[in-house]
């Protein structure tokens, strides 16, 4: 319950597994069907993919966060994982987005929409040849990131279904793999891309994940601001080089501490076509006035980091620099320290 907005938030899910499970629902291979219902705030442009958004460490932020809507979701998910590491996930998602003071739904004619519905139908195909897991009593952990991972996702939401005012039709694909550099460590590499084929509201477009916390979050940008970039086509990359002591091992006292170097380079290059630009498509909702939106004009957003891993066997500390779109940004959005718990085996 929120004491300031005076709204209840809740979530519930029910899953049936076609395979017998010994300890937990994510045991490989998964073959299940799940129905879920959720009502909560939607932190627009800040979707943490591998961390619970209610994590206490995410509550400390470098700037005030007001870009939120209320979102109600009713989902049906079917997941099938095969022994050859090919998986299919099909989903039907009835979603209602409710406007707030900071994220209103207003078109260029001044027409205000308090809320709108979309019914998303999506299919995700994933193939990771050679992928293996270490299964504990509560979770499964991938143990060989050398395996390449290919993911293809397509999402379609027809106009008019359950009152949906717009069509959404978009495709995304990604590739990730670990590359070994012999005695010089290894590189974890990921590249992603996507395109929106339809004329759709901005919340259904392709928005990079901004990370306002002081923690290191995968597949997000540590110094980007929420809704700073909104695109209907993009390509992004994320490279982390783990040097395995290639530099620090030459310093005798430091070598005994077994500290390890970590360097990262990530970026996002996107574009927004006229059909999804609310200034040129009058019936689309305008971007929020409170959002720091900036068109890309062919120049990618980029940031780099350098850090030390294996502090106390479990801590990584990075210093991050923003390379592009620095003009007009506060100091906290140009560079800063970030930390993460990182345990290796």
Locations of the language-model features?
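Exposed, low-structure sequence patches enriched in small/polar residues
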Residues: 1-345
């Amino acid at each position: 319950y929120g004491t300031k907005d005076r709204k209840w938030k809740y979530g519930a899910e029910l899953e049936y597994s076609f395979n017998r499970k010994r300890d937990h629902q994510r045991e490989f291979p998964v073959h299940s069907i799940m129905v879920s219902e959720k009502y909560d705030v939607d932190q627009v442009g800040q979707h943490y993919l591998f961390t619970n958004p209610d994590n206490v460490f995410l509550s400390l932020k470098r700037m005030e966060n007001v870009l939120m809507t209320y979102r109600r979701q009713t989902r049906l998910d079917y997941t099938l994982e095969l022994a050859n590491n090919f998986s299919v996930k099909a989903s039907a998602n009835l979603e209602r987005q409710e406007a707030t003071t900071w994220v209103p739904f207003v078109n260029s004619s001044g027409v205000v929409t308090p809320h709108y519905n979309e019914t998303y139908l999506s299919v995700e195909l994933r193939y990771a040849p050679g992928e293996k897991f270490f299964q504990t009593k509560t979770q499964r952990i991938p143990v060989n990131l050398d395996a390449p991972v290919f993911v293809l996702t397509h999402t379609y939401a027809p106009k008019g279904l359950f009152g949906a005012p717009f069509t959404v039709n978009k495709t995304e694909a990604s590739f990730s793999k670990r590359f070994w550099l012999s005695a010089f460590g290894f590189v974890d590499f990921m590249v992603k891309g996507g395109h929106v084929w339809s004329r759709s509201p901005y919340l259904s477009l392709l928005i990079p994940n901004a990370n306002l916390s002081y923690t290191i979050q995968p597949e997000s940008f540590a110094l980007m601001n929420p809704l700073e970039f909104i695109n209907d086509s993009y390509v992004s990359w994320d490279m982390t080089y783990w040097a395995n002591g290639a530099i620090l091992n030459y310093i005798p006292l430091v070598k005994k501490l077994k500290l390890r170097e970590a360097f990262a380079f990530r970026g996002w290059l996107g574009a927004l076509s006229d059909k999804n630009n609310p200034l040129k498509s009058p019936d689309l909702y305008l971007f929020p006035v409170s959002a720091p939106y900036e068109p890309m004009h062919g120049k990618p957003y980029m940031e780099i980091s350098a850090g030390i891993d294996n502090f106390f066997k479990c801590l990584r500390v990075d210093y991050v620099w923003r390379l592009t779109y620095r003009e007009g940004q506060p100091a906290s959005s140009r560079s800063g320290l970030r930390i993460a718990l990182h345990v290796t085996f």
